[in-house]
Amino acid sequence: VAGRAGRRESEGVVIIQTSEPDNPVIGWVARGDYEAMVRCELADRHAFSYPPYSRLFQLTMRCEDLTLLRQGALFLADAMRAKFGRRVAGPVAPPIDKIRGQYIVRIMLKIENGRSMARARELLREALAQFGAEKEFKTINIAIDVDAQ
């Protein structure tokens, strides 16, 4: 909405509502100091290996049976952790965890820049093959989003 304020002859007004008024981002935005905000955000992203300093793989798992989905997600996350260690986060349920009768959980994988993406894909395929070999999980669908937003 701020982009629409002040488009005419008179200046517009932007109201920022927050539960954290002392957060530095609020100050930077209020002052229009976007360069400081970007510098801080990029430093945080570098420290925690988030894009643009890494690539993200988001695995979205869906199933009508919540108990089975949880078991399958834990199995796959463990198989991935055996190959990627701390680069694996989850499984976690998204805020809307059921759509069209299917429950949803997600697993995130971070691969730092400079690491071999070909090797990462190979290791991920191995973990998915382990998961696929378990017949009990055949009703669980998995979608992979690389560079998830």
Predicted regions and their residues:
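Accessory helical-bundle/CTD segments and flexible terminal tails appended to RecA-like ATPase motors
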Residues: 3-149
